[in-house]
């Protein structure tokens, strides 16, 4: 019996690539053949080949901050990208195509539709971008991580890596935990400059009450370490990048972070109280990702315009481990821990209807 074939469309950022990769690894174990479509010089070009998954690169660019010349050229560029994907589809003939986001999803979804290949769409964020809103009208099946994002879409959560799902729940982690509060600070895989400027100061005010583990990103590593030394001799760790994020989540009592879709989903799967400082997108994408957690008492949201060390200190001083345990349990109650198997089943069911 021949293996079923799937093309995964995902690129540009870890928020699209890592959920797609989690699905890919799950399907490979079930005997599927995987091809990936992405772009060169983006995160997928480094990660996907290392996983022994065949990747095709297409030329495409987004519209953000584009010049007038690029805007004029957009229809031609989209057509060229569409033709590139269509050629890949015709040469390999997949049973199904999965769109996980990024610039490749637009031409990829159109090519799937024109070739009459079942196309299923997954939206990671609470609010969909214009591309996914349009693609959702021609897709075979729509999936969403959060409720109310797309019409007629099934809520499946975001695919989370197994080592994160396997972290013990809050009731086990917090049992008999003593000592200073453990504060994890993450501004995304590349860090966040505003976090690196503002948050070292909290160590001075919290003193021996807290241990801080701060992911700074590579560019600001030395500057951030100097700031901590300036403000405090109390225990802290500054890392450019935390390779084992599951270890960090398991260690922490609370996280201070952006609220990208994958981060929010991971926090609910783990069960961890949070202070979110959403990236100030015009469409409030990250704010909306975190809103359900705040409404359910699992997190606090501070808009970047209001973000100060003093406000963070005030919030942290109002919390103790007992309160953080309650926040963690509330976060845990919102988690979807079987997202990967849900999506896998949808892929299997849709492909069998051909």
Swiss-Prot record:
The record's section on Gene3D superfamilies has: Glycogen Phosphorylase B
Q: Which gene encodes it?
A: murG
State what this protein does: Cell wall formation. Catalyzes the transfer of a GlcNAc subunit on undecaprenyl-pyrophosphoryl-MurNAc-pentapeptide (lipid intermediate I) to form undecaprenyl-pyrophosphoryl-MurNAc-(pentapeptide)GlcNAc (lipid intermediate II).
User: Per the UniProt record, which residue ranges are transmembrane?
Assistant: none
Bilayer topology term: Peripheral membrane protein
A GO term from the CC aspect: plasma membrane
What the entry lists under InterPro entries is as follows:
GlcNAc_MurG (IPR006009), Glyco_trans_28_C (IPR007235), GlycoTrans_28_N (IPR004276)
NCBIfam families, per this entry?
A: murG
Q: Which UniProt keywords apply?
A: Cell cycle, Cell division, Cell inner membrane, Cell membrane, Cell shape, Cell wall biogenesis/degradation, Glycosyltransferase, Membrane, Peptidoglycan synthesis, Transferase
Q: Where in the cell is it found?
A: Cell inner membrane
Q: In which pathway does it act?
A: Cell wall biogenesis; peptidoglycan biosynthesis
Q: Please, one GO biological process term? A: regulation of cell shape
**Listed Pfam families:** Glyco_tran_28_C (PF04101), Glyco_transf_28 (PF03033)
Task: Tell me which SUPFAM superfamilies the record gives.
Answer: UDP-Glycosyltransferase/glycogen phosphorylase
Would the keyword Transferase turn up in this protein's UniProt record? yes
Name the chain's protein: UDP-N-acetylglucosamine--N-acetylmuramyl-(pentapeptide) pyrophosphoryl-undecaprenol N-acetylglucosamine transferase
Keyword Cell cycle in annotation: yes
Superkingdom of the source species:
Bacteria
């Amino acid at each position: 019996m021949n293996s079923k074939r799937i093309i995964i469309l995902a690129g540009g950022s870890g928020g699209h690539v890592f959920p797609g990769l989690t699905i890919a690894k799950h399907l490979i174990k079930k005997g599927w053949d995987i091809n990936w479509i992405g772009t060169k010089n983006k995160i997928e070009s480094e990660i996907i080949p290392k996983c022994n998954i065949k990747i095709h690169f297409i030329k495409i660019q987004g519209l953000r901050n584009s010049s007038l010349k690029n805007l004029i050229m957009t229809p031609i560029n989209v057509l060229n990208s569409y033709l590139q994907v269509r050629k890949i589809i015709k040469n390999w003939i997949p049973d199904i195509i999965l769109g996980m986001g990024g610039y490749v999803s637009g031409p990829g979804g159109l090519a799937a539709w024109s070739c009459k290949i079942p196309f299923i769409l997954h939206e990671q964020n609470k609010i969909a971008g214009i591309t996914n809103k349009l693609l959702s009208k021609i897709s075979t099946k729509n999936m969403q991580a959060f409720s109310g994002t797309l019409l007629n879409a099934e809520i499946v959560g975001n695919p989370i890596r197994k080592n994160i799902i396997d972290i013990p729940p809050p009731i086990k982690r917090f049992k008999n935990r003593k000592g200073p509060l453990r504060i994890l600070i993450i501004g995304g895989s590349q860090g966040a400059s505003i976090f690196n400027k503002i948050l070292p100061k909290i160590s001075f005010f919290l003193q021996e009450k807290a241990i801080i583990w701060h992911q700074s990103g590579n560019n600001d590593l030395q500057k951030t370490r100097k700031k901590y030394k300036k403000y405090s001799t109390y225990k802290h760790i500054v890392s450019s990048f935390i390779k084992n994020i599951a270890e960090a989540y398991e260690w922490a009592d609370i996280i201070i972070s952006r609220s990208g879709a994958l981060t929010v989903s991971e926090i609910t799967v783990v069960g961890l109280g949070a202070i979110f400082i959403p990236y100030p997108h015009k469409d409030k994408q990250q704010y909306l990702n975190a809103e359900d957690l705040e409404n359910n008492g699992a997190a606090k949201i501070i808009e970047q315009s209001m973000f100060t060390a003093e406000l963070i200190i005030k919030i942290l001083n109002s919390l103790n481990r007992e309160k953080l345990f309650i926040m963690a349990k509330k976060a845990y109650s919102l988690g979807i821990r079987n997202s990967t198997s849900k999506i896998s089943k949808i892929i299997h069911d849709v492909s069998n209807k051909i």
